Design a protein with these regions (language model features):
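Conserved substrate/cofactor phosphate-moiety recognition/catalytic segment
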Residues: 25-64
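A glycine- and Lys/Arg-enriched "phosphate-lid" helix/loop adjacent to the NTP-binding pocket
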Residues: 89-161
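Pre-Walker A (Motif I) flank of P-loop NTPase domains
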Residues: 2-5, 76
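Hydrophobic anchor at the beta1->P-loop junction of P-loop NTPases
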Residues: 8
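Conserved lysine of the Walker
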Residues: 16
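A basic- and aromatic-enriched beta-loop-alpha substructure that forms the phosphate/nucleotide-
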Residues: 64-104
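P-loop (Walker A) phosphate-binding loop of NTP-binding proteins
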Residues: 11
Length: 161
C-alpha cells in the first residue's frame, strides 16, 4: 500500500482545484488535478451532450483510473482533484437520468467502471465541497473556461442532487 491520499469532491465550479492547491502548499501534499483541459470531447459535449457524453465520460474514466493508480503508488502524500467515483456515481447517473446517455452506453460504461473500481483503493479521506447552483454559475463565469460557459443550469442542478 502506498502513502495515504486525500480526494476532493464537488460540483463543477465548487472550488476543488483551489482547495487542492491550498492543501498542497499548506501541507506539502502532491496535487493530482482533474484532466479537464486535456479532454478532447469536452467542448463538443457541452454543445451536444447526447452525441458526446459517452466518449467524454470514457475519457475521464480512463484518466481518473491512471490518477488513482498514481495516487496509490505514490511514496509521498497526495491530494486528488475529483475521484473516479464521482464520474460514475454522479455524472454518469445524471446523464442517464436526463436521458443524455442511452441504455447501451450506460451499461457499457458501468461494466467498465465496475472492473476498474475493483482495482483501485478508495481515498483515505474524501472531502465534499457544497455550493449552491447560483454560486456555481457565478464561479464558472468568473473562472472563464470557454467550454463551461454554456453549461445548462439544469445539468448543474442534477449533479448537485
Amino acid at each position: 500500500m502506498g502513502a495515504r491520499y486525500v480526494a476532493i469532491a464537488g460540483n463543477i465550479g465548487a472550488g476543488k482545484s483551489t482547495l487542492v492547491g491550498f492543501l498542497s502548499k499548506r501541507f506539502g501534499l502532491r496535487p493530482l488535478y482533474e484532466p479537464v483541459d486535456d479532454n478532447p470531447y469536452l467542448n463538443d459535449f457541452y454543445k451536444d451532450m447526447h452525441a458526446h457524453a459517452f466518449a467524454s465520460q470514457i475519457f475521464y474514466l480512463t484518466r481518473k483510473f491512471a490518477l488513482h493508480i498514481e495516487a496509490e503508488g505514490a511514496s509521498d502524500k497526495v491530494v486528488l482533484d475529483r475521484t473516479i467515483y464521482e464520474d460514475a456515481e454522479i455524472f454518469v447517473e445524471a446523464l442517464k437520468a436526463r436521458r443524455v446517455l442511452n441504455r447501451r452506453d450506460y451499461r457499457t460504461y458501468r461494466e467498465l467502471y465496475e472492473v476498474i473500481r475493483s482495482q483501485v483503493r478508495a481515498p483515505d479521506l474524501l472531502v465534499y465541497l457544497h455550493c449552491s447552483v447560483r454560486g456555481l454559475k457565478r464561479r464558472i463565469q468568473w473562472r472563464g473556461r470557454a467550454s463551461e460557459q454554456a453549461i445548462p443550469t439544469g445539468y448543474l442542478r442534477s449533479l448537485s442532487n
